[in-house]
């Protein structure tokens, strides 16, 4: 068995030991966010797991990312060589895809032990039954999960800075995509000092056991179950507003933490009224940019999507019998609401049905650790005291993957740190987790497998571009189409010409 604190500590130690100083925040002046994927291996003998002597599991960080920023729409490139979204959760997921690609190569070439075993169909693989994956984030995902109720008479885990949220200028700035410095506002700490934020009490349920139960819903939801019908398409404005006011017992919700993520076109939109009614919940949102709007969906939305389609993406689905799902999400110590997390990650797609074989709406354990990330905004703000200058998000993003070749990558503005205008477009100016490099790694995997052992989806037609390979993953595309039709109809998609590179 494992606990949320064990997962957090493992990730914090990995960050301190395995990630370089380059790309980390400047002490007392910058902060960042951390995310990772942890592989959990259950003991071979499940019978040894008893209340008196719990079974020990093997835990290993297989991907990690830091970062707080996105590029604006005007900086996007059709060559696939820039990272549009450098939020930590997205960086960690892409590094996880690198790890999966490497493990598929090990399996297909029979060189070393792999996390994959042969599936029942030709050319397909599936995850070993004794393995599962836990996603860790030092902070609540931006977007819907960060619309957190503030209750009276409860302790606030981070020191706020006084600001009058009732003033129209402050309200406007908090929801404006173009507001400077708004790259990552998972929550807004600049709330009135008199307000108290709800921190979910930790329960004995923090300890997680192995085995067949690891896909069951988990975590204390004090405010009652989310309605099965909640998703961004079918909630009325009144229903959305009501959800924000749900509170345990007789506690009064006096406000909500703001998210900088803005509602996508086609959604109901925020009321922006003072207090708890400021946001509508359950809506799809895009990440804020600095002067230039982004096309990057919020991390809450992306993680909800991964929970139906898997973390592997379309390319890797060619080789997999079923998607690679996360079994649990662990959040570090920060402003947090169990209700908001469950609503954002699982509640909005509960009624999705008629998915293709292998795909399904997964139940997900959602837990919080008591351990604070030392380079989070809260931690740095508490330490810096009277240090001169503003506290700002770190401009760099660090990527790490458990692969033998070039496991580390440090980027800024979507390119490897140090890239100049003259070098943009060259091989040296590509992150290892850019779309074009992930495509190159996928093609490298194909080159090492005899063509007659390729899965049918790759042999029936000639595939050339990134778009070709994605569209040929028919089961994945069918699942994605179903999810959009039934829950995420307003999802922003990039035009096809951004995927025509090869």
UniProtKB/Swiss-Prot annotation:
Which InterPro entries would you find in this protein's record? A_deamin
- Positions of the A to I editase domain: 63-501
This protein is called what? tRNA-specific adenosine deaminase 1
In its keyword annotation, does this UniProt entry include Coiled coil? no
The cysteines joined by S-S bonds are none
Q: Which Pfam families match?
A: A_deamin
- How would you classify this enzyme at the top EC level? hydrolase
Q: What is its EC number?
A: 3.5.4.34
Q: Where in the sequence is Phosphoserine found? A: 191
Species whose genome carries this gene: Macaca fascicularis (Crab-eating macaque)
Q: Which reaction does it catalyse?
A: adenosine(37) in tRNA(Ala) + H2O + H(+) = inosine(37) in tRNA(Ala) + NH4(+)
Gene Ontology molecular function: metal ion binding; RNA binding; tRNA-specific adenosine deaminase activity; tRNA-specific adenosine-37 deaminase activity
Biological processes, Gene Ontology terms: tRNA processing
Which residues hold Zn(2+)? Answer: 87, 142, 299
Binding residues for 1D-myo-inositol hexakisphosphate, per the UniProt record? Answer: 93-94, 302, 305, 435, 470
- Catalytic residues in the record: 89
* Cofactor binding annotation: Binds 1 myo-inositol hexakisphosphate (IP6) per subunit.
């Amino acid at each position: 068995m494992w606990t949320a604190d064990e997962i957090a500590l493992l990730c914090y130690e990995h960050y301190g030991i395995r990630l370089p100083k380059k790309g980390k925040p400047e002490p007392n002046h910058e902060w960042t966010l951390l995310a990772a994927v942890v592989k959990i291996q259950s003991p071979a003998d499940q019978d040894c797991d008893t209340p008196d002597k719990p079974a020990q599991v093997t835990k290993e960080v297989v991907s990690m990312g830091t970062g707080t920023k996105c590029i604006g729409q005007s900086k996007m490139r059709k060559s696939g060589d820039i990272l549009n979204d450098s939020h930590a959760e997205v960086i960690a997921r892409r590094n996880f895809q690198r790890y999966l690609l490497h493990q598929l190569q090990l399996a297909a070439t029979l060189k070393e032990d792999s996390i994959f075993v042969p599936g029942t169909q030709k050319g397909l693989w599936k995850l070993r039954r004794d393995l599962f994956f836990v996603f860790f984030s030092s902070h609540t995902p931006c977007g819907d999960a960060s619309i957190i109720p503030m209750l009276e008479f409860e302790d606030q885990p981070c020191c706020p800075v006084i600001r009058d949220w009732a003033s129209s200028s402050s309200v406007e700035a908090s929801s404006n995509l173009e507001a400077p410095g708004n790259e990552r506002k998972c929550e807004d700490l600049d709330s009135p000092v008199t307000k108290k934020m709800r921190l979910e009490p930790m329960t004995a349920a923090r300890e997680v056991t192995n085995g067949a139960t690891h896909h069951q819903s988990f975590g204390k939801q004090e405010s009652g179950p989310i309605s099965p019908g909640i998703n961004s398409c079918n909630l009325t404005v009144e229903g959305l507003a009501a959800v924000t006011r749900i509170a345990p017992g007789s506690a009064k919700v006096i406000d909500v933490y703001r998210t900088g993520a803005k509602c996508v076109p086609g959604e109901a939109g925020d009321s922006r009224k003072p207090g708890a009614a400021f946001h509508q919940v359950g809506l799809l949102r895009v990440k804020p940019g600095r002067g230039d709007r982004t096309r990057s969906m919020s991390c809450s939305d992306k993680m909800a999507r991964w929970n139906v389609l898997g973390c592997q993406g379309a390319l890797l689905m060619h080789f997999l019998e079923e998607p690679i799902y996360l079994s649990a999400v662990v959040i570090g110590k920060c402003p947090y609401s169990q209700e908001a997390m469950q609503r954002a990650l699982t509640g909005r797609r509960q009624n999705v049905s008629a998915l293709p074989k292998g795909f399904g709406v997964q139940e997900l354990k959602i837990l919080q650790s008591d351990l604070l990330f030392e380079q989070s905004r809260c931690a740095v703000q508490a330490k810096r005291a009277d240090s001169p200058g503003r506290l700002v998000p770190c401009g760099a993003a660090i990527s790490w993957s458990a692969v033998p070749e070039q496991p580390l990558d440090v980027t800024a503005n979507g390119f490897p740190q140090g890239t100049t205008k003259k070098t943009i477009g060259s091989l040296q100016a590509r992150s290892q987790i850019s779309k074009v490099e992930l495509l190159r790694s996928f093609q490298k995997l194909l080159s090492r497998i005899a063509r007659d052992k390729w899965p049918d989806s790759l042999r029936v037609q000639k595939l050339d571009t990134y778009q070709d390979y994605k569209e040929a993953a028919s089961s994945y595309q069918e699942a994605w189409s179903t999810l959009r039709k039934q829950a995420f109809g307003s999802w922003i998609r990039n035009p096809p010409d951004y995927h025509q590179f090869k």
